[in-house]
Amino acid sequence: MNYEEIFTFDNLLEAHYKSRKNKRHKKEVIIFEENLLVNIENLRRRLIKHQYRITSYNRFTIYEPKKRDVAALSYEDRIVQHCFCDNYLTPLLDKKLIYDNAACRKTKGTDFARDRVTSFLYSFYKKHGLNGYILRFDIHHYFDEIDHNILKGKIDKIVKDETLNAFCKMIIDSLIVVVVKVYL
């Protein structure tokens, strides 16, 4: 699939419908939908002419269930990324992921992950009884600290089309995170 086949009017419209899920009350969604077909066509034209650029992220902090800094895309950028991921990147990468990876994969949601963990725990218990440990942890600022050069090197091995490769890298580089480490 090439760049133009990904960013068709129909694909962008479908991405809009997915992007607005649970967000129909938001101001930018309402404004976008006032001239939906025109906005989709204008977005498609900018993409095809390679004039599309990701806008700045809306940064804010949430405190429930724990404090997290969030960088949210504009609505239009969410549509573009939904379209790109749903029609190209996800089908490409899905084949390369391990079976047990349930993160953001169709047909592999919370129930799938719970069932797999239950299966692994049962299997472990049959072999070892109660002699073992379960570690529950969170990698602090995991996505913020991913080295963009390493990630782009991996993209080079998977995304062979130059235009799609450049588009992928534009998305990767669109979020610049400054991580300050304090050593005491």
Task: List each language-model region with its residue ranges.
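Non-catalytic, well-ordered alpha-helical scaffold segments
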Residues: D10-L13, L37, E41, D77-H82, ...
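Conserved pre-motif C helix in the palm subdomain of viral-like polymerases
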Residues: K67-I98, V182-L184
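Conserved polymerase palm-domain catalytic core
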Residues: R46, F120, F124-L184
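Short, compositionally biased low-complexity segments
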Residues: I6-N22, I54-R59, D86-L93, L175
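Non-catalytic, polymerase-adjacent accessory regions of viral genome-replication enzymes
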Residues: M1-E41
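Active-site-proximal segment of RNA-dependent polymerases
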Residues: N87-D147
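Glycine-/proline-rich flexible loop or hinge segments
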Residues: K18-I30, F60-A71, I98-D100
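Reverse-transcriptase-like RNA-dependent polymerase core
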Residues: L43-K66, I79, D86, A166-V178
